[in-house]
Amino acid sequence: MRAAVGGFFHETNTFCAIRTDLDSFKARDYIDADDVKEFTEYFNDAREITGFLRTLAKYNDDVLPLPAAFATPSGLIEKDVYVAIKERMLERIAFTKPDVVFLNLHGAAVVEGFDDCEGDLLSSIKALVGEGTPIYAVLDLHANVSPLMVKNADLLLGYNTEPHVDIRKRESECVEIYHRQLEKGFVMKTAYAQPPLLLPAINTDTNGGAMTPFIAQAFEYEKQAGVINVSPFAGFYGSDKYNAGPSIICTVTTDVSDAQAICNDISNMFIDRKDSFFVHLDPLDKIICTIKSAPSKKYAVIDECDDPLGGGPADGTYILDKLIEGGINKIGVSTICDREITEMAFVAGEGAVIKGLLGGKTDNKHGRSLPITAVVTKLICKPIPMCEANGEEFADYGETYTDYGRIAVISTEQADIVVTENKVPTEMINIFRHLDIDSNKYSVLVLKGFGHSYKANFSDKEYVYFTAESIGVNNPDVTKIGEFKKIRRPVYPLDMK
């Protein structure tokens, strides 16, 4: 069997001012290789694609490489970049004439001129290969699934985990289901439903968070005869597009009405449990009062509003600014992306004093540029993994590294700040440990991303965690992200009905 394998993966925050260009993909994972050996070696132990390749190898299937492009979440993808990658995919498919196409897609990509990026990509491929060549794709748990995507894919499998530790497993299942279909000859039918909701990502953890009962219910349905797959999606709230929000896909070998009934049931479940996705946000003045009232404790202040894995620019200063203003000391900050300050630090060298404006340079949504006088305490240039979380569930996560570029640790009177040249996620690692810094010396940590992810990596000390009421394009209060112009209406909580 000849299998075309590729991917296009980006979670697009349409409220983020930073456009996603080709360099954004190359900084994460990008390959356009005709050579199978080069392609398979590139994805030898990566988070994505590896699951497809290993299972195809088990069946001795031939791999036909397609472009594979993965970028860290940010703003709109430049049209020329997407069109070039799509056209290259179509050229490769037309030339190689595969028996099946396997793709790793996010499901929440937005391109200039293409709101439904994955729908456009899948429909373009289906128009080329026809009904006789199936298209199987894996989607992120936070995909904004559209009817066009469902119509043009023969099978869509969503991740069942947050954090996303089952990517390889789901890719492998795609290949296994295809071979089962070849062997048994069953015909699959897929149904879809979408409730009128827009949910924040902050509490979508599948290990006790709001998505836990949905995944459990999906697994129960999958025990029924004829049910191939049930995928509930939390959706991504930072994309202003028509189908932003949660959805459900169900694929069966029985009547499609069976699949639709399952989708409708879980859709109603989303409506009934919608409030479980919204978390309490702690006002910063109360956080400061709490810290001052019990200074011997350790605190972690989570900034989800500037989450780099949700498209935030990661140069937000709002929380740090308020803590400094409130007289808080011994602060450790992970991270602020600022190329100017990084360059200044590297030119000055370790031990030097630098003065400048830190952060707040992407837009006016994440705080002001802070005037600083700081000592350059560390300069680092080395690869750092994306994940180091412990536990059996992370055993097959993959050795994915992120391009931090140059890293400078600068120290002011009140804070040590990790400043990066590139925007990077740190929620699944203890960045301080990788920089040979003992995070226990800080009274307060300021961390960007999901609190539940950080807890796994700062478990050596008991912290009091606060999810701060902050500002930014990932605000868990979805009514405060920005003006939604394209999403279907009415939708909760934007219309509060």
What is each residue range found by the language model?
Residues 57-61, 94, 127-130, 158-161, ...:
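Generic secondary-structure signature for well-ordered alpha-helical cores
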